[in-house]
């Protein structure tokens, strides 16, 4: 039984969330659960507010700053598996936001570019994204934001250095 499932069962039984967390989980476990909780809701809320997933918006943003790029290079930049990139690009292509074509010199390479409609979508998404971020970070001071950036960067580095 994980600490999280134990917590859930104890909360149901006792109705005392704060007491349960303090009594049965380490601070490190609480950090992990809070990060997992944020990760679960941020994508859903972001898409609800902006009308586009974070992954697709990231792809469009990269294409916004590139004239044309190979699909494999795009995949490396976003660090999403190639099957997911293909699915995202197919969906974006069906909505007229990107176009794909085979490279004439090497038919194995697919080139991707942003369409005018995709460029307009990026520009309109900027305001929606800013509003989402502003609401997400409400009640978080500038100093706390800088600290959060630093802590999350160090945690990400630590995670990357964990040997699996």
From Swiss-Prot:
It comes from Bacillus subtilis (strain 168). The lineage of its organism: Bacteria, Bacillati, Bacillota, Bacilli, Bacillales. This is Uncharacterized HTH-type transcriptional regulator YdgJ. One of its GO terms (molecular function) is DNA-binding transcription factor activity. InterPro entries: ArsR-like_HTH (IPR011991), HTH_ArsR_DNA-bd_dom (IPR001845), HTH_MarR-typ (IPR000835), WH-like_DNA-bd_sf (IPR036388), WH_DNA-bd_sf (IPR036390). Keywords: DNA-binding, Transcription, Transcription regulation. It comes from the Bacteria. Residues 71-94 bind DNA. Residues 28-157 form the HTH marR-type domain. The keyword DNA-binding applies.
């Amino acid at each position: 039984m994980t600490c999280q499932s134990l917590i859930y069962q104890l909360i149901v039984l006792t109705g005392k969330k704060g007491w349960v967390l303090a009594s049965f989980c380490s601070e490190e476990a609480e950090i992990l659960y809070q990060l997992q909780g944020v990760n679960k809701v941020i994508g859903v809320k972001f898409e609800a507010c902006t009308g586009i997933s974070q992954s697709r918006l990231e792809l469009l943003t990269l294409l916004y700053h590139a004239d044309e790029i190979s699909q494999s290079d795009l995949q490396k930049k976003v660090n999403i598996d190639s099957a997911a990139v293909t699915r995202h690009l197919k969906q974006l292509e069906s909505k007229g936001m990107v176009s794909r074509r085979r490279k004439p010199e090497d038919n194995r390479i697919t080139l991707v570019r942003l369409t005018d409609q995709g460029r307009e979508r990026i520009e309109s998404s900027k305001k929606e994204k800013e509003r989402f971020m502003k609401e997400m970070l409400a009640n978080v001071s500038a100093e706390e934001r800088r600290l959060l950036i630093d802590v999350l960067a160090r945690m990400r580095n630590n995670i990357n250095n964990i040997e699996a």
